Amino acid sequence: VTFPQIFQENGYETAMFGKLHFGNNPKGVDESMILPDQGFYLNPDFIDTKGDTTTITGYVTDIITDLTLGWLQEKRNKEKPFMMMYMHKAPHRPWWPSPEKFAEFTNKEFPEPETLFDDYKNRGTAAKTAEMNLLTHMMYSHDSKIRPETLAKMEGKVLPVVEEFPNSFYGPYNRATAEQKALYDPVLDSINDFFYNNWPKMNDTEKMKWKYQRYMQDYLGSISSV
């Protein structure tokens, strides 16, 4: 038994919008629009109460917010108590800010934490072995938005070597419409041009600093829409 079922059984109208991440068939909800699995930031698919899947054009944070407010303000039975779940995808990795936020936050520089270069010498085994190091684990395409063709042109000059997920750049990118790509591309061009021209000349300290900025720019750009 889920807690929405308990609310429903006690006379509440129930609704759920966004990322469930525990299967795609929520129980005990009168109306739902759920992202399949993790979902996508751009033009995401949603599974409705009947189990049908539809693609909605736009940015996932805006869409989930609009669906939630639409039900809350217009669709629910105002004579009944209600239980509504409003569940954002952001800021789950890989981070894809909206086109506007991508341009805005890529131009920002963020303070570095004192622990950026922590060597974890005095930490436990779990902390030492977790794959959470920006330099050695953060992926070039998946996380930093380096196009696969940029990496290919660099002919082995991209060190350290970091294993990528399949289709980690173009999977999300190719969901964008032509109009959306026109907004993303100038920013992606600037990121890739800088990487191509500077990465091979950087030392590990400089590489860590650059990856930290790319992480913060995309993470905060994604969460700022919430």
Regions found by a protein language model. Name each.
Residues 1-226:
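Formylglycine-dependent sulfatase
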